[in-house]
Amino acid sequence: MKINILTLFPRYFEVFCRESIIGKAIKHKKITINVVNFRDFSKNKHKKVDDYVYGGGPGLLLQIQPVVDALEKVGGLKIALSPQGQKFDQGVARKLAKEDEITILCGHYEGFDQRIIDNFIDFELSLGDFILTGGEIAAMAIIDAIIRLKPDIINPESLKNETFNDFLLDFPQYSRPANFRGLEVPNVLISGNHREIGEWRQEQRELITKKKRPDLWEKFLKIKNKK
């Protein structure tokens, strides 16, 4: 899989591309990340990429020329990061993980000239109902969520019971020691009875989801009732 990142701040991604599963995936040639500074495409002699908004208003807007010229040099599904976009979730991550190539456009300042969105972007994505200074942090989160779903990146068994796979949150997990300052691990987990452990974990997933995320609980019930 190839991921193109269009940004004004390529150094944001230097450590990101070296560390943890992203670094390993790149090292083992499971993915390719191509970071493009779209300032390099500006035809302005000072490499300016922003200007005032027609009709007035605060702040500066990213201009169409450098962004479009950069977009036309890369391939794949083209995604703009924007507060107006579809909310990113695990379902979207799964769909994007099936693509051979995607391009993520990181915004800055007051956003993009609307002609970019209307004519050169396939769709917009948002991490949630809050504002970031730029799209770089959102891009990292989205890329991380996508890459870990690719084959041979993470043990498939580890992915099966992860949060959101079936609209249930994950079960509580514990490690040694079994007793820390009187705080004990549930007895069932050290019983060695794998059937009872499996039942306990499923019960905990349902209880936690119902309590913490009633929206996911409703989705889980709909699927469960259809079976």
From Swiss-Prot:
UniProt-annotated location(s): Cytoplasm
Catalytic reaction(s) noted: guanosine(37) in tRNA + S-adenosyl-L-methionine = N(1)-methylguanosine(37) in tRNA + S-adenosyl-L-homocysteine + H(+)
Record GO terms (molecular function): tRNA (guanine(37)-N1)-methyltransferase activity
Binding positions for S-adenosyl-L-methionine per the UniProt entry: G107, L127, G128, D129, F130, I131, L132
Organism domain of life: Bacteria
Regions annotated as coiled coil: none
InterPro entries tied to this protein: Alpha/beta_knot_MTases, tRNA_m1G_MeTrfase_C_sf, tRNA_m1G_MeTrfase_TrmD, tRNA_m1G_MTases_N, tRNA_MeTrfase_TRMD/TRM10
Enzyme Commission no: 2.1.1.228
Enzyme class name: transferase
Keywords, sorted A to Z: Cytoplasm, Methyltransferase, S-adenosyl-L-methionine, Transferase, tRNA processing
Recorded GO CC terms: cytosol
One Pfam family recorded for the sequence: tRNA_m1G_MT
TM ranges: none
One Gene Ontology biological process: tRNA N1-guanine methylation
Family membership noted in the UniProt record: Belongs to the RNA methyltransferase TrmD family.
Its job: Specifically methylates guanosine-37 in various tRNAs.
PANTHER family in the record: TRNA (GUANINE-N(1)-)-METHYLTRANSFERASE
Subunit structure, interactors included: Homodimer.
The protein's name in its UniProt record: tRNA (guanine-N(1)-)-methyltransferase
Organism from which the protein derives: Mesomycoplasma hyopneumoniae (strain 232) (Mycoplasma hyopneumoniae)
Organism ancestry: Bacteria, Bacillati, Mycoplasmatota, Mycoplasmoidales, Metamycoplasmataceae
